[in-house]
Amino acid sequence: MPTDTMPSSDAAAPPSNGASDAPILKGSEIFVRALEEEGVDRVFGHPGGAVIKIYDAMERIQPSYDHVLVRHEQGGTHAAEGYAKATGRVGTMLATSGPGATNTVTGIADAYLD
């Protein structure tokens, strides 16, 4: 019997491409949702080009975030550490890449050692 005359009841389901109806999330949106899952409601930060999409996603997904604008990344990491110690909540500092990231090292090391 030729394959083109097979009854339709024996026909296989069309192959799935793995797509679903779920919306496709951007990396910044996934990051903000992860912050939510960790209970983060306050972010200390110094905006920059590399993290501007995260700031946009924070405003779009969770506009109730309390953002504390810091003037220097090192001060922001110390502020996040102090916030965590004083409240028992997650202390979060958001910095841009390059010098912004390296400026956080002292504060991160201090938090790690405590």
PLM regions and their residue ranges:
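Thiamine diphosphate
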Residues: 2-102
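Short beta-alpha junctions and helix-cap segments that line functional grooves
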Residues: 104-108
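Hydrophobic or amphipathic alpha-helical targeting/insertion segments
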Residues: 109-114
